[in-house]
């Protein structure tokens, strides 16, 4: 099983609460049909941030 490497989001849009945040598409192992799950992870200055109130 090959879990995809983290990569920049292809079409992240913007982070309303933190406009300068960086989006990373990150995947981890999971118990589903694919063997992994992926999510958009927003960070700013090394800290994970939320984009929606």
From Swiss-Prot:
Binding site for Zn(2+): 53
Organism of this sequence: Nerita peloronta
Top-level taxon in the UniProt lineage: Eukaryota
UniProt keyword Metal-binding present: yes
Complex formation: Monomer.
Keywords for this protein: Disulfide bond, Metal-binding, Metalloenzyme inhibitor, Metalloprotease inhibitor, Protease inhibitor, Zinc
Disulphide bond pairs: 9-23, 15-51, 27-38
One GO molecular-function entry: metal ion binding
Annotated function: Metallocarboxypeptidase inhibitor. Has an inhibitory effect on bovine carboxypeptidase CPA1 and porcine carboxypeptidase CPB1. Unable to inhibit proteases from other mechanistic classes, such as porcine pancreatic elastase, bovine pancreatic trypsin and chymotrypsin, as well as subtilisin A from Bacillus licheniformis and papain from Carica papaya. Exhibits antiplasmodial activity against Plasmodium falciparum in an in vitro culture, reducing parasitaemia mainly by inhibiting the later stages of the parasite's intraerythrocytic cycle. Does not have cytotoxic effects on human fibroblasts.
Protein name (record): Metallocarboxypeptidase inhibitor
């Amino acid at each position: 099983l090959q879990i995809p490497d983290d990569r920049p989001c292809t079409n992240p849009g913007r982070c309303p609460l933190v406009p300068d945040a960086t989006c990373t598409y990150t995947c981890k192992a999971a118990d589903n049909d694919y063997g992994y799950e992926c999510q958009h992870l927003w960070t700013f200055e090394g800290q994970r941030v939320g984009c929606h109130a």
